[in-house]
């Protein structure tokens, strides 16, 4: 039996809505030939399956085993053609590609004038929506046609096309360079996490500024600014400069708020910008502004003119619920947060083919933290085990580390003393494999190791000593992020004061919100 996720045709069919399936069958009906009925039979069979099973297909004798591969490829292609014809999938890029195809067909038939007319309209549409890669492709085809279709205005036309091609090429090279830089920074973040020391910081900073082009930001168009800000956001996250990440993510979102027509043209970038802004607001502990940003994003995505497709639906879920959880951790409303867990687990199942394992595991970690916050340590452990037992998981080392540490603390709180020693051993073995450990992680593990030797009447003082030791790292540039993954200080305060961790965090959030916050300059 082939895994569902590896059988692309099966996954594609399962992703279709009822209307898309209906349209596909109508599309096949218009084709009408006996050979086509085979792939429709295969479509209907796969649509009814809960899991992909090749043997069931062969038992139906739709085709022989040798023919099945070709039939699946043919069906896959026909589904994509049907989807392309669906008005729901007609975004700007698809429309432009369609017009370019039409112009190419007319050119091949020698109908140069008609081809140029279509290209001129398509080019205007591409430039209005900052689709400059497509615009460049259109100009290149215009140049090819003009070289064969001689007119009296050729001289002026040549100068215009050459100027447009040069300008678009320059803009596209800049965007390509900045997108490469962003991708390299993102890869560094996923593989190794955030900078851990001055050496890391110098290495990343040297790389970033060596790669960063010297430009005047005011001279950049919308798309070029977008990539420029994105690269700076990733650099700021990597170097843990949270005010800088707030600054550039704010500029990113403000661009869309100023040019709202770009939201419809580039909805993914709109969502990502808001997500990075909210992550920055979490890092600088600004819950009031965070709520405003989350509410504005939720309102925007429900508007009629916001594009609708499966990719956007999964991203909207990812960014909305991930940030709802972040808000809960900032405010300490853990019991209220439990209400969203059924929604999250249901949507994780619905979007399983759209979300990568890394993001799914982050949800599991945050759900575990929710249960930890309401003293439900057994459920906390259940979700942590989903991460720990996933041996094929490619996840950030720092998150995997705190998953292990939280598991040790949860086992201690749950009273699973018989598991605690094994947990500590496994955690130590895992941490030894890591390149660099934070001092916060070292201190927590040292404390947990000697817990069994501490008498009950000495516990409170031991918690106070650890709290004092960890507090020294709270404002350390490289250590402070550790407290975001695992609010160990609030846990220690709850043990010292005999109060729930939710009470402690809620009290801190109220103090934060009562503080007079001056607007943070982003210029």
Role assignments for model-derived ranges:
Residues 1-207, 217-219, 455-523:
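Flexible inter-repeat linkers and adjacent short helices
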Residues 73-77, 110-120, 151-162, 195-212, ...:
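Helix-turn-helix repeat elements of alpha-solenoid scaffolds
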Residues 97, 101-105, 134-137, 141, ...:
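"A position-specific structural signal for the A-helix of alpha-solenoid helical repeats
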Residues 120-128, 162-170, 205-217, 250-262, ...:
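Amphipathic alpha-helical segments of tetratricopeptide repeats
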Residues 130-137, 172-179, 219-226, 261-272, ...:
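Alpha-solenoid helical repeat architecture
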Residues 143-158, 164, 168-172, 183-190, ...:
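Alpha-helical linker/edge segments of TPR/alpha-solenoid repeat scaffolds
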Residues 175-292:
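Alpha-solenoid helical-repeat scaffolds
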Residues 389-458:
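Active-site/pore-lining binding-face segments in mid-to-C-terminal subdomains
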């Amino acid at each position: 039996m082939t895994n569902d996720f590896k059988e692309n045709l099966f996954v594609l069919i399962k992703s279709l809505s009822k209307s898309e399936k209906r349209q596909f069958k109508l599309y096949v009906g218009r084709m009408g030939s006996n050979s086509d009925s085979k792939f429709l039979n295969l479509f209907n069979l796969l649509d009814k399956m809960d899991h992909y099973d090749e043997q069931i297909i062969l038992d139906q004798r739709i085709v022989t085993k040798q023919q099945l591969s070709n039939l699946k490829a043919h069906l896959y292609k026909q589904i994509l053609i049907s989807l392309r014809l669906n008005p729901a999938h007609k975004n700007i890029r698809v429309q432009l590609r369609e017009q370019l195809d039409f112009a190419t067909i007319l050119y091949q038939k020698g109908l140069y004038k008609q081809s140029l007319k279509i290209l001129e309209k398509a080019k205007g549409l591409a430039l209005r929506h900052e689709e400059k890669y497509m615009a460049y492709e259109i100009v290149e085809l215009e140049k090819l046609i003009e070289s064969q279709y001689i007119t009296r205005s050729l001289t002026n036309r040549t100068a215009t096309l050459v100027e447009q091609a040069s300008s678009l090429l320059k803009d596209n090279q800049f965007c390509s360079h900045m997108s490469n830089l962003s991708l390299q920074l993102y890869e560094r973040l996923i593989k190794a996490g955030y900078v851990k020391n001055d050496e890391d910081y110098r290495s990343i900073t040297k790389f970033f500024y060596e790669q960063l082009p010297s430009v005047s930001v005011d001279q950049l168009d919308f798309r070029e600014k977008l990539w420029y800000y994105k690269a700076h956001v990733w650099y700021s996250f990597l170097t843990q400069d949270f005010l800088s990440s707030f600054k550039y993510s704010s500029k990113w979102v403000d661009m869309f708020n100023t040019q709202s027509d770009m939201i419809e043209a580039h909805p993914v970038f709109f969502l990502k910008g808001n997500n990075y802004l909210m992550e920055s607001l979490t890092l600088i502990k600004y819950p009031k502004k965070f709520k405003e940003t989350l509410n504005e994003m939720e309102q925007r995505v429900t508007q009629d003119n916001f594009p609708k497709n499966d990719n956007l639906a999964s991203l909207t879920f990812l960014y909305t619920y991930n940030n709802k959880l972040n808000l809960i951790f900032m405010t300490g409303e853990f019991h209220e947060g439990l209400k969203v867990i059924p929604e999250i687990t249901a949507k994780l199942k619905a979007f399983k083919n759209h979300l990568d394992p890394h993001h799914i595991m982050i949800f599991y970690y945050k759900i575990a933290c929710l249960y930890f916050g309401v003293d439900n340590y057994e459920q906390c452990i259940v979700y942590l085990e989903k991460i720990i037992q996933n041996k094929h998981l490619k996840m950030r080392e720092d998150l995997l580390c705190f998953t292990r540490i939280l598991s040790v603390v949860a086992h201690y709180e749950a009273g699973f003393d018989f598991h605690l020693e094994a947990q500590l051993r496994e955690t130590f073995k895992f941490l030894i494999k890591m390149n660099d450990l934070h001092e916060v992680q070292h201190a927590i593990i040292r404390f947990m190791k000697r817990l069994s030797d501490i008498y009950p009447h000495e516990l409170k003082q031991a918690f106070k000593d650890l709290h004092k030791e960890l507090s020294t790292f709270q404002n350390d540039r490289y250590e402070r992020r550790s407290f975001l993954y695992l609010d160990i200080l609030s846990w220690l305060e709850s043990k010292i004061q005999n109060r729930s961790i939710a009470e402690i965090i809620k009290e801190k959030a109220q103090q934060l919100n009562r503080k007079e916050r001056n607007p943070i300059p982003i210029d």
